[in-house]
A protein has these predicted regions:
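C-terminal structural segment of proteins
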Residues: 1-208
Length: 208
């Protein structure tokens, strides 16, 4: 890897200050995508901003009709949450199917949606569950957030703070996982609401 400066701020204000002062900085949470990318020299940020210790980014809140999950909440925390298991059990099951125990203990929901891997699980859950992504600058609907392969609507110095999911009447997620990585070779998330049924697909290309 290339040389870089490592920063570990304690507040969002400190994060924004470092971002504004360092044009080639990258956010580090679980590091499950960024660190391997850096090891392969496909990314060379001048500064790594570790947000894993910022408490205001790690939470799961029941708001009645919605559930809000902080960006640094790990996959294991999602699958273990009584709130999620009771209100959106399909989301807990989705998290349980991600990677191996190491990935689930380190990887975060915010990191996953910010990376927007076309074979990742959370993006289709966000779409089917009418999610709203809150950043340090604004709120974005899931439909507008996911732009293309590995591409989102996040602007320069903009980071994900939390994701708010609507609670469906019922929902289910099924995928055909890669035997090694457990990424979805094809996956479908279906959610039923009063106003209709939402279906989102991950991992499947146009040509099959």
């Amino acid at each position: 890897m290339y040389n870089f400066v490592y920063e570990k701020p304690n507040t969002l204000e400190e994060v924004e200050k470092i971002l504004n002062e360092n044009e080639e900085s990258k956010i580090l949470a679980g590091g499950q995508t960024l660190i391997p990318t850096m090891k392969q020299r496909l990314a060379s940020p001048s500064t790594l901003i570790d947000i894993s210790d910022i408490n205001e980014l790690n939470f799961i809140n029941d708001n009645g009709d919605t559930i809000t999950i902080g960006a640094t909440t790990t996959h294991n925390e999602v699958l273990s949450s009584d709130i999620i298991k009771n209100k959106i059990p399909s989301l807990a099951a989705l998290a349980e199917g991600i990677g191996d125990p190491h990935v689930r203990n380190m990887g975060t929901i915010g990191g996953s949606i910010s990376n927007n891997d076309p074979t990742a699980d959370y993006p289709c859950a966000c779409l089917s569950l009418k999610a709203k992504i809150k950043t340090n600058k604004k709120e974005i609907s899931a439909e507008d957030f996911f732009v293309g392969l590995f591409e989102t609507a996040l602007e320069e110095n903009e980071i994900v703070i939390s994701i708010e999911f609507c609670i469906p009447q019922k929902a289910s997620y099924m995928k055909f996982p890669n035997p090694a990585s457990r990424y979805a070779m094809a996956g479908v998330y279906v959610a039923v609401f009063d106003d209709g049924i939402n279906v989102s697909v991950t991992g499947a290309s146009e040509n099959g």
